[in-house]
A protein has these predicted regions:
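N-terminal signal-anchor transmembrane alpha helix
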Residues: 3-26
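Alpha-helical transmembrane segments of multipass membrane proteins
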Residues: 15-23, 62, 91, 95
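Membrane-interface helix termini and inter-helical loops of multi-pass transporters
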Residues: 30-43
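Membrane-interface loop-to-helix entry segments
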Residues: 46-61, 103-115
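Transmembrane alpha-helical segments in integral membrane proteins
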Residues: 60-72
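Membrane-interfacial loop-to-transmembrane alpha-helix junctions, especially the N-terminal start
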Residues: 76-85
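Hydrophobic alpha-helical segments of small multi-pass membrane proteins
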Residues: 85-93, 108-122
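Membrane-interface helix caps and helix-loop-helix hairpins in membrane proteins
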Residues: 95-107, 127-131
Length: 132
């Protein structure tokens, strides 16, 4: 049983980390590229080196939350929670592609709005499953 829990934890952790790594791989040249460097950014924009550790931490926390949901829900409740999580992860992935790779700022904004709605939906769904 413990090995099954460890495997579930590892899989839940790896899913968002792989998605994040893949989007980072696709957009790696764009983040330091001319297009992004020429954008007008606010004074509080953090330096580029901050993003890798912050996103790694966020994707790790997403994986932990997926594991908590996986272990504490069953049936239709689990199915809906994993669907919302997957939708959020897809929107997260798409934002990097839309903004950095394709330079589609307006579509990136639309994606972020959908992502925030999905995150709120996810918080509501996950809160009903487990209050840590």
């Amino acid at each position: 049983m413990k090995n099954k829990k460890n495997l579930s934890f590892l899989i839940c952790l790896l899913i968002p980390l792989i998605v994040g790594s893949f989007s980072g791989f696709i957009t790696r040249y764009e983040v330091d590229g001319t297009w992004f460097n020429l954008l007008k950014k606010p004074s509080f924009n953090p330096p580029n080196w901050v993003f890798a550790p912050v996103w790694t931490t966020l994707y790790t926390l997403m994986g932990i939350s997926l594991y908590i949901i996986w272990m504490n829900s069953f049936g239709e409740i689990r199915k809906k929670a994993v669907f919302v999580f997957s939708l959020q992860l897809l929107l997260n992935f798409l934002w990097s592609i839309l903004f950095f790779y394709s330079h589609l700022i307006l579509y990136g904004l639309f994606d972020i709005i959908l992502l925030w709605i999905c995150i709120c939906w996810m918080i509501i769904k996950f809160t009903g499953i487990n209050l840590i």
